[in-house]
Amino acid sequence: MKYSGRTATAIIEFPADMILLIKRETVPFRGYWALPGGRSERGETVEQTIIREVKEETGLEVEVVRKIGEYHEEGIQDKVEYDYYPACFLVKVIGGEMQKQIGEIQDLKLFSLQNIPENLAFVHNQMIKDYSSSRES
């Protein structure tokens, strides 16, 4: 099976240099930590995608602050081939209540930027590095 297409990923910033990561329940990268996000639906902008995906996965309502970057990620993980073109956005919480999506997410957890887990899915480590660099400039 091959997954491909346009995706959107969110860095949800919290006080004290914390960001929200999800632990994936689905392949590829089952059991890995990841930034919230997912595939765009037909006719949806990447900005609309990230607002929808964050709500589905975390229960939080967000608005886009700015784009962090555009990426390409491809490979094989868990016997699943993937070829994605994600846009990564910084978003801020404007409502909702944090709760994980049953069946898709194993866990939700806040991590400090100095204590990000090593087992990150896709190219999310690079996205977090780019976000950190953009905060310092």
PLM region spans:
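Conserved N-terminal beta-strand and adjoining loop/helix that marks the start
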Residues: 1-19, 86, 90
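Acidic/histidine-enriched, glycine/proline-rich intrinsically disordered or flexible terminal extensions
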Residues: 133-137
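Short, charged/polar surface micro-motifs in flexible loops or helix N-caps
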Residues: 13-18, 28-29, 41, 70-74, ...
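Conserved Nudix-box catalytic region and its N-terminal flanking loop in Nudix hydrolases
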Residues: 18-56
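NUDIX/MutT-family hydrolases
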Residues: 90, 99-131
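A generic structural micro-feature
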Residues: 2-4, 32, 79-85, 102-105
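Active-site-adjacent beta-strand/loop module that shapes the phosphate/pyrophosphate-binding cleft
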Residues: 72-97, 127-131
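A short coil-to-beta-strand element that immediately follows conserved catalytic motifs
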Residues: 60-70
